[in-house]
């Protein structure tokens, strides 16, 4: 009976360890999935992780946030906010975090409070640099304007993510 309980605990630990290991990239050991941005003005998106694979399309927006969903050697499988993606060489990606505004005329507040002074308004689709994030708000910088916006109005940051 005791041997069975010990075996059950060991199996549970192994399963938990295996599932934890799947949350990290096999190449970089960074969290998976994770957000990055497009470093280059253009980035070829390929069907597979090599130069021999066909280019399906080209990302053409520098600083566009992308979500890394897989790693293979020097290649990262990414997707954009519309779910489109493929394999991109890691040299075209940056760890600098950006987000896309998902709400038209999004107000940036001076503090993470809807009653705070309004600093600016951003149109839908604007790319902003991501700063610190609390439980509900993130600090953004876009076109020289700074302020706080609610996380649910942004693509490129997880709702549970906290950044300092």
Write out the residue ranges for each language-model feature.
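Bacterial N-terminal signal peptides that target proteins for export
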Residues: 1-9
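N-terminal signal peptide c-region/cleavage motif recognized by signal peptidases
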Residues: 16-19
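SH3-family beta-barrel domains
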Residues: 21-47, 58-62, 69-84, 88-112, ...
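Intrinsically disordered, low-complexity polar regions and short flexible loop motifs
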Residues: 50
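Beta-strand-rich domains and repeat architectures in extracellular enzymes and scaffolds
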Residues: 54-55
């Amino acid at each position: 009976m005791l041997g069975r309980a010990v075996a059950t605990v060991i199996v549970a630990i192994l399963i938990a360890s295996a599932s934890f290991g799947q949350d990290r990239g096999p190449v970089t050991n960074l969290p998976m999935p994770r957000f990055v941005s497009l470093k280059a003005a253009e980035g070829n998106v390929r069907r597979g992780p090599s130069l021999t694979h066909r280019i399906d399309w080209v990302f053409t927006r520098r600083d566009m946030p992308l979500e890394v969903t897989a790693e293979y050697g020097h290649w990262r499988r990414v997707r954009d906010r519309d779910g489109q993606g493929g394999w991109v060489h890691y040299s075209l990606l940056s760890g600098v975090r950006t987000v896309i505004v998902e709400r038209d005329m999004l107000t940036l507040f001076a503090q993470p409070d809807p009653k705070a002074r309004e600093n600016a308004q951003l149109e839908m689709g604007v790319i902003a640099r991501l700063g610190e994030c609390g439980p509900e708000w993130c600090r953004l910088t876009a076109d020289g304007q700074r302020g706080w916006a609610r996380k649910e109005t942004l693509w490129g940051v997880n709702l549970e993510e906290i950044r300092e």
